[in-house]
Amino acid sequence: MKLMVFDVGGTEIKYCVMDESLVREEAGSVPTPMSSQEEFFDVLCSLYEPHRGEAEGIAMCLPGFIDSENGRCLGGGALRYNQGRDVAGPLSERTGVPVHIANDGKCAALAELRDGALRGCRNASVYIIGTGVGGGLVINGEILNGSHFTAGEFSFMRLTNTDWRDPGTTVGMVCSTTGLLDLNRRFVDSSTDPLITGRQFFEKVNAGDGMSLKILRRFCKQVAMQIANLTILLDLEKVAVGGGISSQPILIETIRDCLDEIYSDPGPYFDPALPKTEIVRCRYGSEANLVGAYFNYVEAR
């Protein structure tokens, strides 16, 4: 079965045609429209049109609280124009093919559970480091949606109790690529070292730049603390780290090392019998959302 698959993010829409062997063809990306749902549908339809007759349906993952069964976006995430509105139905009417939608983090978790780093796990999670932090929980061998479709929304968790309203205390602002680059800006003189991208930051890390290595470790310590908290709460076997920067081996290595450090000297208020989870890289990396969206469509039929 060939499907048109969309991974809708806050900055870009990744797309491809995918078949049951998970081969991705005609892949590309375009900027995500930010003005209206109508413009959003226009872009999706224009991307689908060249594949009409080839792709028999549309599988899509997107940010927000997604009611997959009814094709509704209850919370729009970065795309506020989708909040509280139907997405699958109107898009299906315009394209004339079935449309299935799901949350992006849950799609990543499904991809890794069915055919990736979490295969065979009963209780596990993906931790997707991007503009924010995406999550998807596997509980008792199934993807956990939650009572209101909000399970795994790690970005909204707080790191301190100082000010709930301060976005700078959220996991999404601190433990994301956004947070990593913000940390770099705070510790590096911008007059001599201008704003850099994630790729440029890791070029410095891999070249052995001392300050960049310190910044990375500080960032990974925060991520490791959140993974430790999730493990204490849910008794997770594995946590698969994904997102664009997960392709950097030193990121995964440093998160593991920081988690080892936490468990080796946790302080007095900690039971040494508490298990430490295994940290792995998502098999599908930044493609996990696309693969999971395909699986979601097939399993929903």
Which ranges hold each PLM region?
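Active-site glycine-centered loops adjacent to acidic/histidine catalytic or metal-binding residues
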Residues: D104, G130, A293
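Hydrophobic "anchor" residues
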Residues: V23-R24, C73, I143-L144
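Glycine-rich phosphate-binding loop of actin/hexokinase-like ATP-binding domains
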Residues: R119-V174
